[in-house]
Each structure stands twice: as structure tokens, then as C-alpha cells.
């Protein structure tokens, strides 16, 4: 009778241990899955909007990164050179050691020079790219009458001008954002547009953002032509 009781207790302990292991594994998988979903959602909301309109800022950041990298490399070269010279002093005047240390210093200098050349070339290319982006922004603002404003909550406001022939500075605006599912949402049109739901559905199907802006401008233009 005592042996049977011990067997039952052992079976119960084994079952509880297996249940505990399955529970921990399942909880870990759920936490990991939820973290991946949140990570994907944040990435989709970020990448979908600023790929085109932050090119200029990214180029400037890269120039600063190259500059900081060169400064950091200079410090590292100086530290390594100092350490190498200290090693040479400890080892005395042995010619072979001095030659090896000199070669190491020379290689470090050549490496630094190559990085400087790459950084200068990238800075020059980035400056040209920034000029092109500035020209494009000027074209949008002055000729096409489109201004883009960043709002809170990862929203962008598109302000169209040069629509009303009687008042070219009159703004026609619309707010565009991404919802939790990564779909476009078009809201806050001023003045209101009756066809906004149709435009929103179409851009969700085609993902053609340029066509959405073109349709919004056409609708605002048609609305502006009715004003007397």
C-alpha cells in the first residue's frame, strides 16, 4: 500500500513538471510573438512615410557620422601610436622590433587616409544629393503649390496652394496617416471632399500614393473653380 502511494506521488510530480514546462514554453512563445507583432507594426508605420521626405535629413546625418568616425579614428590612431612607441621604449633599441612597429604605424596611417578619402567622396556626393532634394522641395512649394507638414502621431498634412485663381495662397489641406493595420487613412480635408472615402479605398488597393495626391489636387481644383 505504501509503495502504491509513492508511485502515485511520483506520477503526480512528473505530470506537474511536464505541465509547468509546457506552460513556460507557451508563455515565452506568446510573449515573443507579441513582441514581433509590435516590432513589425512600429516598423511599418515608420518606413511607410519618411522614405522619400527624409532623404535630405538622412544625407546630413551621414555626413556628420562620417565626420565623427574620422575624429574617432584619429583618436584611436593616436592611442595606438602612443602604445606602440611605449612598447618600443620597453623593448629597447632592437632594430627588428622598431621596423615592425614602424610598419604597423604606416599601415594604420594608410588605413586612415583611405577612410578620409571615402568620407570626402561621400560628403561631396551627399552635398550634391541635398542640393537636388532642395531643388525638388522648391519645385513642390513654388510651382506645384504643395507643402508637407509633419504632425503628431506619425501623421502628415498635405497643403495644396495655387488652386484658387482669385487667391493663389489659399490653402487646401488634407491629413494622411497609417492605421494599426498599416492601411492609409485620409482625414481632415479642408474644405471637405465628398469623394474622400473613394480615394482612401483606392489607395489601399493600389498603394499608389502619388496618384492619391494627384486625385486630391484635382478634386480641390474642381472645388475651387466653383467658388465665385
Swiss-Prot record:
Record InterPro entries: Spc25, Spc25_C
Coiled-coil parts of chain: 61-144
Keyword Repressor part of the UniProt annotation: no
Subcellular location: Nucleus; Chromosome, Centromere, Kinetochore
Example GO BP: chromosome segregation
Highest taxon in the source lineage: Eukaryota
A cellular component annotation (GO) from this entry: kinetochore
Keywords, comma-separated and alphabetical: Cell cycle, Cell division, Centromere, Chromosome, Coiled coil, Kinetochore, Mitosis, Nucleus
Pfam families attached to this UniProt entry: Spindle_Spc25
Quaternary state and interactors: Component of the NDC80 complex, which is composed of ndc80, cdca1, spbc24 and spbc25. The NDC80 complex interacts with mis12 and zwint.
Family affiliation: Belongs to the SPC25 family.
Purpose of the protein: Acts as a component of the essential kinetochore-associated NDC80 complex, which is required for chromosome segregation and spindle checkpoint activity. Required for kinetochore integrity and the organization of stable microtubule binding sites in the outer plate of the kinetochore. The NDC80 complex synergistically enhances the affinity of the SKA1 complex for microtubules and may allow the NDC80 complex to track depolymerizing microtubules.
Protein name: Kinetochore protein Spc25
Annotated organism of origin: Xenopus tropicalis (Western clawed frog)
Gene that encodes it: spc25
Amino acid at each position: 500500500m505504501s509503495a502504491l502511494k509513492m508511485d502515485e506521488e511520483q506520477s503526480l510530480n512528473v505530470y506537474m513538471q511536464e505541465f509547468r514546462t509546457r506552460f513556460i514554453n507557451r508563455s515565452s512563445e506568446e510573449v515573443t510573438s507579441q513582441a514581433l507583432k509590435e516590432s513589425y507594426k512600429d516598423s511599418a508605420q515608420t518606413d511607410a512615410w519618411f522614405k522619400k521626405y527624409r532623404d535630405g535629413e538622412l544625407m546630413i546625418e551621414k555626413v556628420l557620422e562620417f565626420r565623427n568616425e574620422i575624429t574617432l579614428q584619429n583618436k584611436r590612431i593616436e592611442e595606438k601610436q602612443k602604445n606602440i612607441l611605449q612598447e618600443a621604449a620597453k623593448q629597447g633599441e632592437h632594430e627588428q622590433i622598431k621596423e615592425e612597429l614602424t610598419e604597423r604605424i604606416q599601415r594604420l596611417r594608410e588605413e586612415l587616409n583611405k577612410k578620409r578619402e571615402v568620407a570626402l567622396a561621400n560628403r561631396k556626393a551627399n552635398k550634391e544629393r541635398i542640393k537636388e532634394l532642395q531643388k525638388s522641395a522648391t519645385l513642390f512649394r513654388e510651382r506645384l503649390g504643395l507643402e508637407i507638414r509633419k504632425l503628431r502621431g506619425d501623421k502628415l498634412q498635405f497643403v495644396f496652394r495655387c488652386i484658387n485663381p482669385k487667391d493663389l495662397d489659399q490653402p487646401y489641406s488634407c491629413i494622411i496617416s497609417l492605421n494599426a493595420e498599416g492601411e492609409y487613412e485620409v482625414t481632415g480635408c479642408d474644405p471637405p471632399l465628398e469623394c474622400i472615402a473613394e480615394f482612401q479605398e483606392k489607395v489601399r488597393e493600389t498603394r499608389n500614393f502619388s496618384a492619391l495626391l494627384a486625385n486630391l489636387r484635382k478634386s480641390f481644383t474642381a472645388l475651387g473653380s466653383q467658388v465665385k
